[in-house]
């Protein structure tokens, strides 16, 4: 499409491996940096793995202090509040795994509490992982346990992992996440949204564990912070809705922010052989450059679609949401009028097309998806969730 490739989607902690499935949690000393919503969820989940936990927090009285103190009553937690910033690198002595809360930048260019300690951990070969890595470990472990439980003694069943749909972008993430989950539920799937939208990734895992019912589809809203810290991620389908300059108080520069967004299409996997369906807004050059290395792609935009399976708008007196035929791009299927959306705007029409493209990775049946789309009202406005120490903004 004449768009040059952007910087490769590299993490500041790229060479540290992901968490192996055979990880011995009870013998592990895990350090959690920050105890916002994400940090608290990590702590609760780690307690279930019987890990020994240290928590470092620069605030003397973080918002979740009462819940944190209730958890602190359990012997395997060492709680350290009101620490000077930056955290002393010596804190990482004797630690096996460090989990930074997403709002803490690892970059020395930004005066935050975590960067010096993370640099020391990296130099010493200490494993650093993000909450997305814990989430991925948890769902793989649950699938493995289910496979073992259901198998005959002499038969190993193939691992049946849930579908994972991932959404990122500078704007529109929450609406698209809600849309995709609502559409799939209307189509008969057990779909669970989580991530930058509430509940957090691990709070959702814990709730599903308690219900003894994992969803068929996870619909994840992911911020650039969460993606930057992750060491491995293999979604079923992922979309980057759009990219504009944002959160340069966390990222090294705009290129670093763009690279983090591109990680939604997969981390630690071979892009040339990947089975991930990569979806993007074709009128955003940054998004299209991120998609360029990938094999399976689908686009959406405000003009008519011109590739098989792509989505767009077509003006025929009214504005129609359309999809190009998967066998003949010249044939376009009218899906519904854009004005039939209850959340009516050109921006939400793009969110709706992105949600449809994501859901098509789960089911080819368009009719129930379109019925649900006509009824979708949204209802959750932009929300600011402080995920960590000194994090003033959310939804990057």
Positions of PLM-derived features:
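N-terminal leader/targeting and accessory segments in enzymes
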Residues: 2-145, 149-151, 378-379
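Adenine nucleotide phosphate-binding catalytic loops in nucleotide-utilizing enzymes
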Residues: 28, 33, 101, 161, ...
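Short beta-strand/turn micro-motifs composed of small residues
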Residues: 34, 57, 99-100, 195, ...
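Residue-level detector of alpha-helix initiation sites
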Residues: 37, 171-175, 349, 353
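Phosphate-binding loop of NTP-binding sites
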Residues: 47-48, 87-93, 102, 106-282, ...
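Anionic-ligand anchoring segments at beta-strand to alpha-helix junctions in alpha/beta enzyme folds, i.e.
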Residues: 48-51, 193, 364, 380-382
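Active-site-proximal loop->helix
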Residues: 65-71, 203-208, 385-387
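Active-site regions of enzymes building and remodeling cell-envelope glycoconjugates
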Residues: 73-80, 126, 293-302, 319
